[in-house]
Amino acid sequence: MALVLPLLPLLLSKVQGNPEVSLEGSPGDRVNLSCIGVSDPTRWAWAPSFPACKGLSKGRRPILWASTRGTPTVLQHFSGRLRSLDNGIKRLELLLSAGDSGTFFCKGRHENESRTVLQVLGDKAGCRPAGSTHGYEYPKVLIPLLGVGLVLGLGVAGVVWRRRRLSPPPPPPPPPGPLPTFAPVINAEPQRPLEQESKISGHLDQEPSLHYADLDHSVLGRHRRMSTVVSGDASTVYAVVV
């Protein structure tokens, strides 16, 4: 009876058609995945234990399908690391990598399945090696600070917008004045004042008219004496005083 109790979970799993196998390895090791209790497997699925390590979401996802051409189709995540060891997909070989920890499901045509639980040494929920916690703590501090800064910025913007809305509008600018006009430049002689013109005209009225001045009789006598010598064609000279 004591020997039967430890084997009871395994027996129940075989009866239910969902046998489970546990494997363990390190990155770089090769492990075999086998379908136990599934006669005609059609596909394999994988539910990662730490999906954040691979940038995946939770839940199972298909990783390999049987193909009529003989070469199974492998998901990109396991491409180059997962291959079949027989003509079908009943036995597989996987080259382990960090983050491969999880449960592998072998599904049959009648939806029966087997499970293989794989634990890769070094995989952790935080997906970080020991001694490098500082780099992962930085985003935890930075993200809340960014959130607080965003809230403060939105608050200040709201206050400024409300003040502008409540403040009276500025007065309209004054209309533009007329453009300055410039008088044309005319080169004209300065006009004399009327008073100056009257004085000038008065002086002109007082000036004596033209008259003959008294001539020196001695000169005239000398002229008479010379007239006997000079021919009669000589011109007469008159003196006019203005």
UniProtKB/Swiss-Prot annotation:
Coiled-coil stretches: none
Location in the cell: Cell membrane
Motif window: ITIM motif: 210-215, 236-241
Signal peptide: 1-17
GO terms (BP aspect): blood coagulation; erythrocyte differentiation; integrin-mediated signaling pathway; megakaryocyte development; megakaryocyte differentiation; negative regulation of signal transduction; platelet formation
Top-rank lineage group of the source organism: Eukaryota
Tissues where this protein is expressed: Expressed in mature megakaryocytes and platelets. Not expressed by immature megakaryocytes.
Membrane topology classification: Single-pass type I membrane protein
GO cellular component terms, semicolon-separated: cytosol; endoplasmic reticulum; Golgi apparatus; nucleoplasm; plasma membrane
Primary localisation category: membrane
The keyword Cell membrane appears for this protein: yes
Sorted UniProt keywords: Cell membrane, Glycoprotein, Membrane, Phosphoprotein, Receptor, Signal, Transmembrane, Transmembrane helix
Keyword Cell division among UniProt keywords: no
Glycosylation site positions: N32, N112
Membrane-spanning parts: 141-161
Domain notes: Contains both a transmembrane region and 2 copies of a cytoplasmic motif that is referred to as the immunoreceptor tyrosine-based inhibitor motif (ITIM). This motif is involved in modulation of cellular responses. The phosphorylated ITIM motif can bind the SH2 domain of several SH2-containing phosphatases. The 2 ITIM motifs of isoform B are required for the inhibition of CLEC1B and GP6:FCER1G signaling and platelet activation.
Subunit structure of this chain's protein: Interacts (via ITIM motif) with PTPN6 and PTPN11. Binds to heparin.
Protein name (database record): Megakaryocyte and platelet inhibitory receptor G6b
The encoding gene: Mpig6b
